[in-house]
Design a protein with these regions (language model features):
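A basic, amphipathic helix-loop patch mediating RNA/tRNA/ribosome contacts
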Residues: 1-43
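Conserved beta-strand signature within the Rossmann-like core of class I S-adenosyl-L-methionine
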Residues: 166-179
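Conserved class I S-adenosyl-L-methionine
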Residues: 75-85
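A short glycine-rich, Lys/Arg-flanked "PGG" loop and its adjoining helix->strand segment in the class I
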Residues: 153-168
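Core SAM-dependent methyltransferase catalytic element
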Residues: 222-238
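Conserved SAM-binding loop of SAM-dependent methyltransferases across substrates and taxa
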Residues: 86-97
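Conserved alpha-helix/loop element of class I SAM-dependent methyltransferases that forms part
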Residues: 58-75
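S-adenosyl-L-methionine
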Residues: 104-152
Length: 238
């Protein structure tokens, strides 16, 4: 039986979360760490499983790192989580004492504790391009963005009117969706540093062109070394 299926059943969590628990060292057998979700193994009673994830998904670890790096205090802040998905960002925001988090995505799969949290307002089956119709101007203290299969450049202007003056925009920069097909290898892992730097500069320029001021950017925690090197970028609305 696959290891991720065993972990999923024993913890009562999704298969994706089970895989992340395995990859982050949460499973061992008689002292040996098992870190391959696809490992075919018998359900051994000596299999030690610990849910190592502090948040609903690994996105929460990325968000926590960014908040700490930029010294962002979100206590009593009103936030919008764009690309909420499994709830990692949202989970981190509410645990850091946000007043309210509007969570938006095409397919939200939150754990029960987020679904029942009164601070969380869910906008499921909702396209990011509709944010201007959904929310009033100057509503949010912070907008966080974690999207895939789309460039950030065309979306940034949508967020500007929704953020209060001196409010923040925190983007997760994913090079595989920003460098263009020419620089995207079949593996999907972008290693061309010049292409990555150029794409990063383009995203920053797009934000500055609509009135944001860049505060800085930082790498996300290197949880999986074989994946694309993501960065978080912080902007302030002037």
């Amino acid at each position: 039986m696959r290891l991720d299926l065993i972990v999923s059943e024993r913890l009562g969590v999704s298969r994706t979360r089970a895989q992340n628990v395995i990859k982050t060292g949460g499973v061992s057998l008689r002292g040996e760490i098992l870190d391959k979700p696809s490992l075919d193994i018998d359900p051994d009673p000596d299999l030690a499983i610990t849910d190592t994830l502090r948040y609903a998904s690994l996105g929460g670890v990325k968000m926590e790192h960014a908040l700490d790096f930029f010294h962002l205090d979100i206590r009593d802040k009103v936030c919008l989580d764009v690309g909420a998905a499994n709830g990692g960002f949202t989970d981190c925001l509410v645990k850091k004492a946000a007043k309210e988090v509007d969570a938006l995505d095409l397919n939200i799969a939150f754990p029960a504790h987020l679904l029942s949290d009164k601070r969380v307002i869910i906008h499921d089956k909702t396209n990011v391009k509709s944010v201007g119709d959904l929310f009033s101007k100057d509503k949010f203290d912070l907008i966080t963005v974690d999207l895939s299969f789309i460039s950030l450049i065309g979306l940034i202007p949508l967020f500007y009117p929704l953020i209060k003056k001196e409010g923040a925009l925190l983007l997760l920069f994913k090079p595989q969706f920003e460098v263009g097909r020419k620089f995207l290898p079949k593996s999907g892992i972008v290693r061309d540093k010049k292409a990555i730097d150029k794409a990063l500069a383009s995203v920053i320029a797009a934000a500055e062109n609509v009135g944001f001021k860049m505060i800085g950017h930082c790498p996300v925690p290197d949880i999986f070394p074989d994946k694309n090197k993501e960065r978080t970028i912080l902007f302030i609305k002037q």
